[in-house]
Amino acid sequence: MKDRFASFLLDTNAVSEWVKPRPNPGLIAWMEATDEDRVFLSVISLAELRYGVERLPAGRRRTRLEQWLEQELPLRFENRILPIDLSVAEAWGRTVSRHEAAGRPIGVMDAFLAATAETHRLTLVTRNVTDFALPGTILNPWS
C-alpha cells in the first residue's frame, strides 16, 4: 500500500543502493510500496554521488554511473531535489550543536542531510541510523 501521508528524504546510501548489482531487497520493496512523489533528494547526496563517480577509473561502469547521475536522477526527481538554503543552514547549526553537546559528533554531510530533513519535515531514509541518533525521524528499510 502506498504511504500517502509521510514524505521522505533519501540518504546517499539509499540512492546509491539502486545501482548496485544486487540491491537490498528491503529497500527495493520499500521504494516500490512508497509513492515516489513523496520521496526527495538533497543536493548533498548529489555531491556525494558525484565525488564517488569522480573517483572511479575511466570505463563502462563510470560512464554508466555518470549517465545515471547527470540524466536519470535529475529527471526522476524533477522538482524534488532540495537545495541548501538559509533555513537548512540554520538547522545545520542546531544539528551539529546538539550532536556535539550529546558527545556524538556528526559529519558535515550527514548534518546537512539531517538539517534538510528537519527543515522540510521529512523522514530520513538511511541504513546508517547510528549516524543520526538524535532528534529526527529515521527509517531503515534495510532491517
What are these model-predicted stretches?
Residues 1-3, 114-143:
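Acidic, PIN/NYN-like endoribonuclease modules and their adjacent C-terminal/linker elements
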Residues 1-44, 54-71, 130:
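Short, well-structured N-terminal submotif of metal-dependent ribonuclease cores
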Residues 2-6, 51-57, 75-123:
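Active-site neighborhoods of divalent-metal-dependent phosphate/nucleic-acid chemistry enzymes
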Residues 11-12, 27, 49, 92, ...:
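Generic structural signal for small/hydrophobic residues in well-ordered secondary structure
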Residues 15-16, 47-50, 133, 139:
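Nucleotide phosphate-binding site architecture
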Residues 17-18, 30, 52, 92-95, ...:
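Residues that scaffold the ATP/ADP-binding catalytic core of kinase and kinase-like folds
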Residues 35, 77, 134-135:
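Short, structured coil segments at secondary-structure junctions
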Residues 40, 82, 139:
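General small-molecule cofactor/ligand-binding pocket signal
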